Amino acid sequence: MESIKKVMVFGSGPIVIGQAAEFDFSGSQACKALKEEGIYTILVNSNPATIQTDTDMADKVYLEPLHPTIVEKIIEKERPDAILPTMGGQTGLNLALELHRRGILDKYGIKLLGSNIRTIEIAEDRELFAEAMAEINEPVTKCKAVNSVDEAVEFAEEIGYPVIVRPAFTLGGTGGGIAHNKEELIDITSKGLKYSIINQVLIDESVLGWKEFELEVMRDRKDTCIIVCGMENIDPMGIHTGESIVVSPIQTLPDEFYQKLRNAAIKIIRHLGIEGGCNIQFAVNKEMTEYRVIEVNPRVSRSSALASKATGYPIARIAAKIAIGKTLDEILNDVTKETPASFEPTLDYVVVKIPRWPFDKFKTVDKKLGTSMKSTGEVMAIGRSFEEALQKAIRSLDIGRFGIIGDGKDKDYTDEEIEEILKNPTDERIFVIAKALEKGWSVEKIVELTDIDEFFIKKIKNIVDMKKELEKLKEEIKKLNA
């Protein structure tokens, strides 16, 4: 990689739901990492309200639209040796694909770093993805890419309802949803086709209610692979990972099954030839006997930012250095200053991420959570136990709550309201679970209604039980002082 002296980095453009400050964080790290290695860095981003567009972040900053015609003019002027698109989220990958399709990369002899064109296409084209996974015997859901409503209806009737509708080349589940019948499918597919840049939606077999896990994987040019972080979505499949409460390290997966997912993740990143960071999502059935590979993001993702902050392992920085030819054993860990980046981080604490929804500002928006993102931010908290981290995260949300219960701001839900929210989750579900437990609902009933693992419901029950215990002690102290 000695021939690479000048690299162009794509930002992610305007802040939208599903693509926000996480990519500014990643892009800033990448620019600093490239400059550390003496690489002349050119940043292209249309959003001036970012850290990465500060003048000291890159050698040259272009505040221009992330459009192939504009970017070609910048390429013609700057003549970069390579482009790093994997720090710009879905926008960066889509732009790299379009530059390739227009022949601009070949015309100027530009190398693509991090992920190659075939890998990007496999990750985004569901049929290519299914074929790639079949080549290495990794299970995926039954799916089909369709370009019309009629095709969608035909395939849904073949595999049975419900089905998941996912527009191709979009972020945050935009335009997608869960169709339980033909009418819903027609409605969601019609909208989804408009959102997709290639007018294509993916009809997926439903794995609603299965557990969802994510692994952040790193690989270098010498084929060294490590798992940086394992994350568990508390909410089941059917709720977008950006809408779910997430905990790290993984809490409910037996080690034997975790090793299965770990081996699968390493097999996938090797097969796709990704050099740098990669996020892989798995669905696991409740009995923990089967899994499906749901998605591969061949780029730094929203989850990568969480994994970086949870572990202290700077994924974007190291991915940028790998992209220009460094190997994991050549890069020092920023935290220890001694061990190489090829050592997998281990956590002796619990990290909880909770999304922040803007429903206080948009009062007429449907609050139900599903496969499309509605949250506009998130908080992360660290504790020695799940209970501690959860309570800290709730307090950090800036919604006026000091915990899930017992702060004097609990709503008084009826049993009917509780059952409805447990079945059809909204942003209030975590508080409703606590209220149900306080009212004497059994753990088993809540598990049945929510599909959330019993482990997490019992952890929330510990908080509720502590509240009751403290109330008893308060009464006893009053008697003693009387």
From Swiss-Prot:
PROSITE patterns: ATP_GRASP (PS50975), CPSASE_1 (PS00866), CPSASE_2 (PS00867)
Residues annotated as binding Mg(2+) 1: 281, 295
Presence of the UniProt keyword Cell inner membrane in the record: no
Gene3D superfamilies linked to this entry: 3.40.50.20, ATP-grasp fold, B domain, Carbamoyl-phosphate synthetase, large subunit oligomerisation domain
EC main group: ligase
GO molecular function annotations of the record: ATP binding; carbamoyl-phosphate synthase (ammonia) activity; carbamoyl-phosphate synthase (glutamine-hydrolyzing) activity; metal ion binding
ATP-grasp domain location: 130-324
Residue sites binding Mn(2+) 1 per the record: 281, 295
EC numbers: 6.3.4.16, 6.3.5.5
Alphabetical keyword list: Amino-acid biosynthesis, Arginine biosynthesis, ATP-binding, Ligase, Magnesium, Manganese, Metal-binding, Nucleotide-binding, Pyrimidine biosynthesis, Repeat
Pathway named in the protein's UniProt entry: Amino-acid biosynthesis; L-arginine biosynthesis; carbamoyl phosphate from bicarbonate: step 1/1; Pyrimidine metabolism; UMP biosynthesis via de novo pathway; (S)-dihydroorotate from bicarbonate: step 1/3
Cofactor requirement: Mg(2+); Mn(2+)
SMART domains: CPSase_L_D3
Binding site for Mg(2+) 2: 295, 297
Cofactor, free-text remark: Binds 2 Mg(2+) or Mn(2+) ions per subunit.
Role noted for this protein: Large subunit of the glutamine-dependent carbamoyl phosphate synthetase (CPSase). CPSase catalyzes the formation of carbamoyl phosphate from the ammonia moiety of glutamine, carbonate, and phosphate donated by ATP, constituting the first step of 2 biosynthetic pathways, one leading to arginine and/or urea and the other to pyrimidine nucleotides.
Domain topic, free-text comment: Corresponds to the N-terminal section.
Annotated family: Belongs to the CarB family.
PANTHER family: CARBAMOYL-PHOSPHATE SYNTHASE [AMMONIA], MITOCHONDRIAL, CARBAMOYLTRANSFERASE FAMILY MEMBER
Entry protein name: Carbamoyl phosphate synthase large chain, N-terminal section
Source organism of the structure: Methanocaldococcus jannaschii (strain ATCC 43067 / DSM 2661 / JAL-1 / JCM 10045 / NBRC 100440)
